[in-house]
């Protein structure tokens, strides 16, 4: 195991110790040995996971480093699912820092891999993420196009949130008729009209 992989293994092992209550005096429990084997076989997945952990810990630079290394390995392995997830995660990392010009290409790259390995749920969320970036960068026409595409791919349980986003965009454009239409479409999906109208009034 090379030095970098050993570093990854140590970090993931620590997480496993903390989350599973495996801390004891045994040098390596079976689950840690199994974790090491998994990391050796799928280092890109481990890197993506560590990126998520560091993102949650608000360490954006470290998260970015792990994501970029995961992508480097993933591009070689052609693991499309991992590439989709990692590009989306990296896009979200940039979006949370308001670096929208870097977030957008990451989401679009994820979308390109979704053409190679279709997944309607991931496609819907990726399209929604792209729509949000266009909305934030004052490109409402493009945002509307991507929101509508996201709705067409979305599962019923997720559709209300996308309709809410689109409705709020129409409100910001003072297109009250279309905003109302989004409310009406979301109502039967959300179950609580008061909650829905409250969201639109924010």
Q: What function would you assign to each model-found segment?
A:
Residues 1-45, 89-93, 130, 142, ...:
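Bacterial Sec-dependent N-terminal signal peptides
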Residues 26, 76-79, 113-119, 153-158, ...:
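Short coil/turn linkers that connect adjacent helices within long alpha-helical scaffolds
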Residues 32, 36-39, 48, 52-56, ...:
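Conserved alpha-helical positions within TPR/SEL1-like repeat arrays
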Residues 141, 148-202:
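Alpha-helical solenoid repeat scaffolds used for protein-protein interaction
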Residues 50, 54, 74, 94, ...:
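Eukaryotic all-alpha helical interaction scaffolds
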């Amino acid at each position: 195991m090379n030095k970098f992989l050993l570093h990854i293994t140590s970090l993931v092992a620590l997480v496993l110790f903390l989350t599973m209550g495996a801390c004891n005096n045994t040098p390596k429990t079976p689950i840690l040995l199994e974790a090491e084997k998994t990391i050796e076989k799928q280092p890109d997945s481990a890197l993506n996971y560590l990126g998520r952990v560091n993102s949650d810990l608000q360490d954006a630079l470290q998260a970015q480093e792990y994501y970029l290394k995961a992508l480097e390995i993933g591009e070689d392995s052609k693991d499309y699912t991992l590439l989709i997830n990692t590009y989306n995660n990296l896009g979200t990392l940039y979006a949370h820092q308001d670096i929208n010009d870097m977030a957008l290409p990451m989401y679009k790259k994820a979308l390109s891999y979704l053409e190679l390995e279709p997944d309607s749920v991931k496609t819907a969320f990726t399209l929604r993420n792209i729509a949000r970036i266009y909305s934030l960068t004052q490109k409402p026409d493009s945002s509307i196009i991507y929101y509508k595409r996201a709705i067409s791919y979305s599962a019923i349980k997720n559709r209300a949130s996308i309709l809410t986003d689109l409705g709020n965009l129409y409100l910001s454009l003072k297109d009250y008729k279309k905003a109302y239409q989004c409310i009406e479409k979301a109502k039967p999906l959300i179950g609580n009209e008061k909650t829905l109208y409250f969201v639109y009034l924010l």
